[in-house]
Structure formats: C-alpha cells, structure tokens
Amino acid sequence: MKLHFYGADRCVTGSCHCLEINGKKILVDCGLQQGRDELDNRYLAFAPGNIDILLVTHAHIDHTGRIPLLVKNGFHGRILTTRLTADLMKIMLLDSAHIQESDAEYENRKGERAGREHVDPLYTEQDALDVFKYVTTCEYKEKVDLCEGVSAVFTDAGHLLGSASITLELEENGVHKTIAFSGDIGNVDQPIIRDPQLLKKADYVVMESTYGDRNHTEVWSYTDELAEIIDETLGKGGNVVIPSFAVGRTQELLYFIREIKDQKLVKSTPNFPVYIDSPLAKAATTVFCGDLHGYLDEQALELVKDGTHMFTFPNLNLVESSEESKMLNMDTTPKVIISASGMCDAGRIRHHLKHNLWRANSAVVFVCFQSPGTLGRRLLDGVEKVKLFGEEIAVKAKIVNFQGLSSHADHDHLVQWIKAFDPKPTHVFVVHGDEDVAPVFAEELNSLGFHAHAAKFTECYDLAANEMVSEGYISERKRTAQKSRADNLYAKLVAAAESLLEFAKRCKGRPNKDISALTGQIISLIERFRE
C-alpha cells in the first residue's frame, strides 16, 4: 500500500500520483508540465504498461495532457472519470494533440535548415482518440469498485464542470485505509458551477496548494469591474484582449458579458463586438450548453429553466479559421477578443498580443493564473518588451490583473476545506503549489495540528505503516535553455532508472543465469560511472 509522487510536486503543473496496492497500480491524473515547471514531457518516471487504472480529477491539460502519451507508450488499462470530464477531456486532448503536431512541424521546418534531427510530436490526434477506447464514466457520489481492495467515490470539487475530489477506500492484507485526492479545489461563489463539496473522513489526504500563500482580492461585482475596463478601453478606440483558458474561464466570461449587455453597463459602445478566437472554446461551450443535470449551481439552473441562454448575446462572434483570426487585427473597430492559451505560451493569443501590446489605448486583461516562466506572468510582472514571432514588441498597453476571478480556492478556503475532516487525517501530502508555496502551506497545516509535508518528485510513502519509504528530490525546473537541457537529461536518467527497476521486478521467475547476467551488467554500469 504505497503512494508515489510523479508530478505537481512543489510546482503547479504535471499532476501525477500513483497508488500501489494488491499488485495493482492506480494512477491519479497524468498532466502536462507547463512553463517553468517543465522538465521533459516525453519521459514518464514509471512504465506506462504497468499501470492498471487511471483516475482523472478534471479535464485541464495540467492534469490530463500526458494521457495520450501514456496510451501511446503501452497503457491499456481502465480510465475512470465523471461524464462531463470525459466530454471536455476529448475536446482538450484533441486540441493539445493538434498543438503538439503543429509545434513539431514548425521545429522540423527550422531544424531541417539547421541540419538538426527530426522531431516527433509528443503525441498525435490519433493517439488522443485512442485514449477513449479505455474511458468509462461515473457520476458524483457513485461508489465504483476498481479492483481487489479498492473502491472510489468522486465528489464535486467545484473547480470546473465535472471536476472531482476522489476518495479511495483501501484494503490490503487486512489493513484498511482511506485516501482522498483533492484534485483542484474550486473557488466559492463562481458562476455556473457549484461550490466545492467538503469531504469528512480520510486517513490520508493529497491536497493542492495553488493559492496556499494568499487570498483572492475581494471584488464587489465581477460584472461591474469587467464592464468598467471594457467601457474605458473601447471608449479610447482600443481593443480589450483577454487571454483565457478555453474551457471554464471563457464560459464564465461569456456569462459576465451577457449580464453586462443585459444591464447596458458599457456606455461608450453599447453593442460592442466580442470575438471568441478559439476553436477549442467554441467546442467546449457546446458541452456547457448540453446535459448539465447534476453539475450546475442553483442560479444557473434557474436561468436554464427560464430559457435563458447563458453564453450567448448580440454581436458575439465565433472565429473559426486562422485566416479569420488574422483579419481581426486588420479591423480597426474597437472590440473584445477572448483567445487561448490562458498563459500566452501558445495559440492565437500570441498574434493578438503582437498587434495590441504596443498600443497604449488597448488593454490586456488577465483572468487566469499565470505560472512562473510563462509570457503571461512576465507581462504581469511588468516587463517592458517581449519577443513574439521573432519581433521585439514594446509593452505600452494597459495590463490588468482581473483578480478574484479564479477557479482555485484561496488560502482561507483551502484551510477551511482541510479543517472539514473530522477526525484530522493521519497525514496530509501538500502538492500542486510553487516551490516557495507548498512547503510554507504544509508548515501552516502543522501549526494547526495536522501532520503534513510538501511531497517531492519520486517520493514514496507506505500508507499501511505511515512512514516514508524514499524521500524523492526537488527537481530543477526550467530557468534558461542551457539549464533546461541539463534538467531534461537528468529527467531522462531518472526515467531510465525507473524503467530499469520496473523491468527488474518483472524478472522474478526467470532463469538464474539470466538474472545473474543482468545483475552483473547493472553493477558494472554503476561502477563505471561511480567516479
């Protein structure tokens, strides 16, 4: 009964944890590393073919983005998640695969001229489609038997439609334990979705800490504040450019803008045009407009009953092709442009930034968390120039951090969430927080009477004995290109070592001659590089 940590350990992306019990291995999430957190997404610290079950907390790419790689490299087990997470995950993984293929094509065009080796995409659209051969779904509060000695219950985490905290009941060799994986804990009073449902009992808790060191700014009215920004900017003849996550945050923005238009809060340009420049956002919005029984909050349910279309309003335009996207920047009409990616590291948003950052009458409004190392974070931190598509762009636009609009619980609500457990858990593993946040939040939990620590990469913990098996290490994250290369090589070494260990475990029962030969080669290799 062991718990392994393979991602989002003292960082906020790449969530991946593995439970080992009764000869089975159960993975919880398999996310993409992003921004400064990235080591090397190609290398998994375990053998995919040895994973029996994958549980998915929600559809965001930092929790799902390496599932196609998992399947591509040999996973053929069961994938379990909620119905709406499965719907959103299909859209997001296909979009992610398209980005992977496009990025590889771009690198190969450049690399061919420079004589570099061919680069394969991390995975393809077909790899993403293959994931859904293994997906099964459940609803909230439904108890699902996973394998001998393990059952799962998904509870609404209030972070995104379909998002869940997952509680596992465990039994091995007569030992009974319960472990809860928080997933991403949602903020309260968000439009559309319900507040996070509190959990009551667990021996162990794996808990996120994204905002473990701060509270959200109190906002009197999201609608009024956004209307003020739009009114001021459009009145000056500029554009409001909003980098946004295509799934969840874009739909919230549409919800607010519908209210703004209904209440006629923008005086300078009452019928202002809004462009959703993200095919992914368009596809996701169709899910948000579908069968949401069991997922919506009460206010949203009332709107649906009244026949209100929550995400549509006059002069809303959905941009399809890249040609249409480019034409937006040729049109001088003041407008609102909502585009992905939310952290500005990829996607069409980068073109809109190129054409608007230098304009003093435009505004760039950040409505999403910006990870360290991303372009979005650099803009929020006040950088004066950025390079986009090989061109240096001056930052003269108004940069607005639309605080308070977050799908993550803040510090006080995280504390409230963990305090709901009665009795206190035996141990709390703090994950999904920056290197300077997760340990501090863990220490605060200790001061509140919990036993907690911030988990490290490759850490292993024996849940039956309540003791650390191996401590793991703090990965060196991406800082510079040179540093990143060193990190990637080290990650490959660790991944190779993990694969070797998995292979060695499967050698039980082989002829003694083979085992002896392999042992000799491993020892020889270690001795060769020991110095």
Language-model segments: residues:
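Short, compositionally biased "basic patch" segments
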Residues: P191-V206, L292-Q299, Q370-K396
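A general structural motif
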Residues: I185, E218-T223, T312-E324, M343-D345, ...
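Short, surface-exposed amphipathic charged segments that create phosphate/polyanion-binding patches used
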Residues: V150-F154, V287-Y295, V415-W417, A465-S475
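Hard-cation-handling environments
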Residues: I229-T374, V386-K387, D422, V437-P439, ...
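Generic long, charged, amphipathic alpha-helical segments
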Residues: K387-I418
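His/Asp/Glu-rich metal-coordinating catalytic cores
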Residues: M1-L55, H60, T64, V71-E252, ...
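A polyampholytic, Gly/Pro-enriched intrinsically disordered region
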Residues: Q100-E105, L292-K305, V469-V494
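C-terminal, active-site-flanking charged/polar segments
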Residues: R359, D434-R477
